[in-house]
Amino acid sequence: MNALTLPDIARQTTTADLPLDWVGMQGIALPVQIGGQRVAAEADAGVSLDDPQARGIHMSRLYLALAELEQGELDLSRLRAVLQRFLDSHAGLSRRAYLRLRLAPLLRRPALVSPLSGWKRYPLVLDTRLEGDDFQAEVHLELTYSSTCPCSAALARQLIQERFDQDFAGQPLDHASVLAWLGSSAGIVATPHSQRSSAHLRIGLAEDCIGLPLEELADLGESALGTAVQTAVKRADEQAFALANGQNLMFCEDAVRRLHRALQGYPQASRFSIRVVHAESLHAHDAVAESHWQRGAA
């Protein structure tokens, strides 16, 4: 009995005569290595279908090419090599290749004062594409931080002044009594409102960038904001965090400008967009600000 040749329907032609921008798969489970740790990722992989008469692409070839990402540290050269394999396996069919990775690596972050440290998750998306020799890579990174409202802080200070005036009206002031008053609940009669906030960074990486600068970008953004959310803390760390919030009062406009200035000076960024969201504790809605920049643009 002769063995039958398995049919390959993707090789058939179509009468539709229409090229397609993107064909592929999304949500592919994949382990990758970043920063020396194994991380679960999801991949979206695809190519353009430029032959208008080709019925489809060979999705299994894309899937198998992704195995290269398991072989070592994830970097831009490895991502580019995978995209090139996408195109090589679709010669005559495709001119553009795309790959998106979604992952949430962990970074160990130190406490502000004490020797404690803990792990913090950084949601990350890597978008890459290749067309000819044109390789583009973009990092989407989310940072969380605390934002204390400058207006609320001013109103709280005014209430403290008024209470001080009431409690000490007509009395001679001495250092000990004022110090005791400032440390009492009667003295700090009001506090400003603050909230957990998020910054969504989309950064186009320069052509000469090789590695994935996750920790660099996280450090850069958190340093600019000054109030990154913490992991393990003692009371001394919590006090230092309260001080950081008091010294870094921020509207959403302030936060996005801080990040803009920091990223503008980052040499590996060719372009970026920033969106900050302050999940208001005073209001039932969010305060949002955005900024965009491209190197060399007027």
UniProtKB/Swiss-Prot annotation:
Catalytic activity: GTP + H2O = 7,8-dihydroneopterin 3'-triphosphate + formate + H(+)
Keyword hit for Hydrolase: yes
GO molecular function: GTP cyclohydrolase I activity
Tree of life domain: Bacteria
Top EC class for this record: hydrolase
UniProt-listed PANTHER family: GTP CYCLOHYDROLASE MPTA (PTHR36445:SF1)
Protein name in UniProt: GTP cyclohydrolase FolE2
